[in-house]
Amino acid sequence: MNSLTFLKRVLPDKGFYVSIIINEGDAPQQAFFPTVEELANYCLMADKNGNNVYYAVSSFNTKGKRKQDNVCLTNTLFLDVDCGDGKPYANQKKGLAALLKFIQDTGLPAPMIVSSGRG
């Protein structure tokens, strides 16, 4: 799956979209875009230039304000499954099994699963 396809799948279909660049020692830089295509292009360019690039999971009503009272839409539900020593699941395999059972038991649609790699 490419970046544009991913972003179109997880982001709402209206509002302004935000990219945030956070590099060590620098103030975060945010940029607003009217389309997911422009957001994806900017993120890819910023990444190619060696930046740490993030995107906001919500869209916003107006440019310039990435705050809760300016949120237009949020299109995703996030569930954090902690795995590892001292966490609810001993490893990712057990955490994934519990997640899949939860999805089956609740009737939620098939998810997109992302492993952050740090439990």
Where are the model-predicted features located?
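DNA replication initiation on ssDNA origins
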Residues: 1-76, 86-89
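Short beta-strand-to-loop capping motifs
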Residues: 81-83
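Catalytic residues for metal-mediated phosphoryl-transfer on nucleic acids/nucleotides
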Residues: 79, 108-109
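Short cationic amphipathic helices and targeting signals
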Residues: 77-79, 119
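A short, contiguous, amphipathic alpha-helix enriched in charged residues
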Residues: 85-103
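Short secondary-structure junctions
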Residues: 18, 109-112
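Short, solvent-exposed loop/edge-beta patches enriched in aromatic
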Residues: 49, 105-106
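Short, conserved phosphate-binding/catalytic loop or strand-edge motifs used
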Residues: 113-119
